[in-house]
Amino acid sequence: MYNFTEEQLASMKKVEATREERLNNLFPRMSAEEKDAVLKENHPDYIESAYENLKVGPNAGDKVLHELAALLQGKSRVLGKTIDLDNPDYEADVLVIGGGGAGSSAAITANANGAKVIMVTKLRIGDANTMMAEGGIQAADKPNDSPAIHYLDAFGGGHFAAKPVLLEKLVTEAPDAIKWLSDLGVMFDKDKDGNMITTHGGGTSRKRMHACKDYSGAEIMRTLRDEVLNRGIQVVDFTAAIEIIKDENGNAAGAVLLNMETGEIMVAKAKTVIICTGGAGRLHYQGFPTSNHYGATADGLVLAYRAGAKLLYADTLQYHPTGVAEPTQVFGALVTEKVRSLGAQLVNKDGKAFVYSLETRDVTAASIIRECNKRGEGVKTTDGVGVWLDTPMIEMIGGEGTIEKRIPAMMRMFANYGIDIRKTPILVYPTLHYQNGGIDIDGNCMSTTVNNLFVAGEAVGGIHGRNRLMGNSLLDIIVFGRDAGKAAAEQAKKVTVGKLTLSHVDEFEKKLEDAGIKPEKLSPQLLPDYTRKDM
């Protein structure tokens, strides 16, 4: 049994006492006006002091978080180094930067379209946020659903800010993405007749969440990684891209690489480049914990920005409502939304529900922050404060064995610390989860401002608008990974690479100097900084 405090145990008894009553009395959904109010008053995206305006680059004048601004306007790692661009160490038709779900999908598809592909990844293939995804992947492939309904759910959930051409691509290609994954060997949950089981997510009007228990991302990544390796695609691991190389015509034409183990600098020349570097959770914006993997440090945004790529919605992040608040050993780890879709309710220290559990993620997160901070109704934890996620309700609704069958990974994670989520509620608080914004692309997955630079996955801005619905990120890495891979392979057939240059890096440095910026922070950051500053 986990060593809960006396205060936590007393609060837990109140949760148990109200459970039966709450089972038949769902908390009402918010009106549009109530949602706007709770967001503006409580969501981290609305804390003006956390932001600054960029002074140089394609997005000069736009606001971004301080941590990201320091990297976008940071010091290039290639300055002062002699780099031989005339004798590249690697040459390919398509260079894929990143080894997660988007990068793997892109590499597989580019290879299938006849391109010579090289994948570089600063960690290992599969060390990515894809592995951390739990709940599932959306696709409107049931008789009562359609891509049009999926579009409306996602467009509204993203505050009507998504780029229509990108969102349309996401929802219309979703059913084929599920089929592609299934054909590759992904083992989705099915009923006894072989039909895929689907569930709701926050903000969905239909059950369209396809899952692999509660380790959907790991199962998808396992399958994609195997396909990359089975195809014999060259993977250069523990090697980071630290600068995009352009040719004399201003087109993306490769990358400067850094061996993470030896420090060796190398050059990769390519006809097209695909950035699939994922998110930025390990920058710990505003001091938040994160559900992200160790390498999520916004590298792709930095590389693209210095090369002249415009960003879109870089000021907006997703804070997943339910990160672990206790035990401290897994502080910030993801508690999948599927827990709530199966019936678990969010309740305060007195056992009272305070929000409909499947509101959109930003609204739910803001409601939890309000309950804990402004209202003072949270439960004290080792690292701060949290609210209860009443997991025993799942088996009251679905019957004994539901938790072990539907969310076994979640059950095991808490069992490691002596918490049986079938009998005991768990403490949660929002955790930094997803980069809503990213690099601005067109309908062909190419940067709107840099030719031959393609982007897929979490590094893209505009697919989800200003908030993402559950299950649409695992979907976008497949849809846009495949499309970027195909588009890059086709584009490579038309490209003749000019003389390689890094002149854009020197030009960016001059703009920083002219703006009075003396960057001290090396960028891209590559790895999180957890060194103590007070030693």
Label for each model-derived stretch:
Residues 1-3, 76-77, 82-93, 101, ...:
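Glycine- and aromatic-enriched mobile tails/lids
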Residues 94-97, 267-278, 455:
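Short hydrophobic core segments
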